Amino acid sequence: MLTSLALIFLVGLAMSAICKQIRLPGIIGMLATGIVLGPYVLDLLSPSILGISADLRKLALIIILLKAGLSLNLSDLKKVGHPAILMSFVPASFEICGYILFAPMILGVTRVEAAVMGAVMGAVSPAVVVPRMVKLMEEGYGTKKGIPQMILAGASCDDIFVIVLFTTFLQMAQGGHANAKDFINIPISIVLGIVLGCIVGYLLYRFFELAYKKNHCVRNSTKLIVILGMSCLLLAIEEWVSAYVTVSGLLAVVSMACMLKVKSTTFVSKRLSEKFGKLWIAAEVILFVLVGAAVDIRYMAKAGAMALLMIGAALLFRAVGVCICMLGTKLTWKERVFCIIAYLPKATVQAAIGSVPLAAGLSCGTLVLSVAVMAIVITVPIGALGIDSTYKHLLEKE
């Protein structure tokens, strides 16, 4: 395992540095590192690392979501209003509709199988989008109109909506029926996640304040460890109560961080955000190298040109969905184009659930996985490069 960790960090950082030298986003190098070192090419990563890959990826995602929550200005988010809510489900819904309408014609699957494929593909990647929106907030690009805050909030909720739909469509493809309860669970999951996170965040704030008043000074480094541990517990709670009620653990993590920012002094929240930013340097490498390692590149050839056509058509539907979310806002056409670009990347969810239909024995399983792999390899570079190279031209600096 130690050798694997050494390879992940050293080769991942080296490839990231090379990509940055040629003006490409570093995550492209990390993703390529994972693909090459992973089990489907050189097979240099130990099974023990790959066995806990999903948990490590989730931990890395927790770190960037905590930084996001500690950087998020809620007053700016309030300015945005309803588009932030619409961005959490409208673009994904449009993309799924694109698959349902065109996948049977282009790829020869049934409508239900097309719905399963659309649900796999519908989520934007918070791992790609969130750190970039945090960077924009720190640099002051688009913050006057709350653009990065809106995209960050939408990307955090988007996954919940898509995963619930995926579970429902998968049941239908296996001969089951859609359950109204599954759809009701979407808002319940979001609301309970926010409430749980806010409660835990407030209790943590009170704990730190009480310790300070009793002359037990808790260092910010210690606070970081406590917050990280509590975040892991929130995700564990999501699993513990899943049989009874749905709670979004990741949304609870963001809400907890937001509550800590609101209640704490500016100095403390800024210091904590900086510390999570430093932790993200290592977490980002782990996340994207392991996402790359989960990608079976052999399925790229199986997907073929028709899969590429389908991905492109569905992304056009997604772009229309993003534009609809912007209706009634004061955003310029440049800012709307940026929102479309920011909502392109696929990675985290697709790497996590892309192989589930195949494991479930669906006849479309191989095709779904092939399309998911192709989408990751294509949209991560395009989305990351698109955001990094256009935000200074498309957004206003505050």
Locate each region found by the language model.
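Transmembrane helical cores of multi-pass secondary ion antiporters/exchangers
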Residues: 1-398
